[in-house]
């Protein structure tokens, strides 16, 4: 993985490389974590995701003790809906130790539709709520990085 990243960096045409790993603690996830500068943890607002977030935080902490260079940039709330349960869970997340990005990604049918079409959401439905949210989140993330946060 590190050789791949070095080759991409040498090429000079890529500013950011994103590894989108499936949930779980696999060899691919560990390799991606060990090769990363930042970790963004996407979380849907439900009990399983909260437990997964706790597990991932413990695993990253363990890897940091073994030389993981990456820092957790924050939690990205996905499939957000305007409900009382989501609002309460959102507030609970924000009380934790892991930073939470201000921009949530709203739930929309366009996201699963784009996966069935095998087309990135940005091309499939750029004006969808989630498409707009992802662009806002990228601005938030890069804005923090560009300002030393």
What does each model-identified segment do?
Residues 7-103, 109:
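Conserved catalytic-core segment of NTP-binding enzymes
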Residues 5, 60, 138-141:
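Hydrophobic residues within well-ordered, non-membrane alpha-helices that form the packing/core
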Residues 136-148:
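C-terminal alpha-helix
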Residues 114-137:
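C-terminal boundary of histidine-terminating zinc-finger modules
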Residues 107-115:
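Short, glycine-rich, amphipathic interfacial segments at transmembrane boundaries or analogous
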């Amino acid at each position: 993985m590190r050789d791949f990243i070095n080759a991409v960096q040498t090429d000079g045409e890529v500013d950011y490389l994103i590894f989108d790993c499936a949930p779980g603690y696999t060899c691919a996830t560990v390799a991606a974590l060990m090769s990363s500068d930042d970790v963004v943890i996407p979380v849907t607002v439900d009990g399983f995701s909260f437990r997964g977030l706790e597990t991932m935080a413990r695993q990253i902490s363990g890897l940091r003790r073994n030389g993981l260079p990456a820092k957790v940039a924050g939690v990205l709330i996905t499939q957000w809906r305007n409900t009382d349960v989501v609002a309460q869970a959102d507030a609970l997340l924000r009380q934790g130790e892991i930073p939470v990005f201000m921009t949530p990604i709203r739930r929309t049918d366009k996201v699963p539709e784009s996966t069935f079409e095998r087309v990135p959401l940005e091309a499939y439905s750029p004006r969808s709520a989630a498409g707009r949210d992802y662009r806002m989140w990228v601005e938030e993330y890069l804005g923090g990085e560009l300002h030393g946060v």
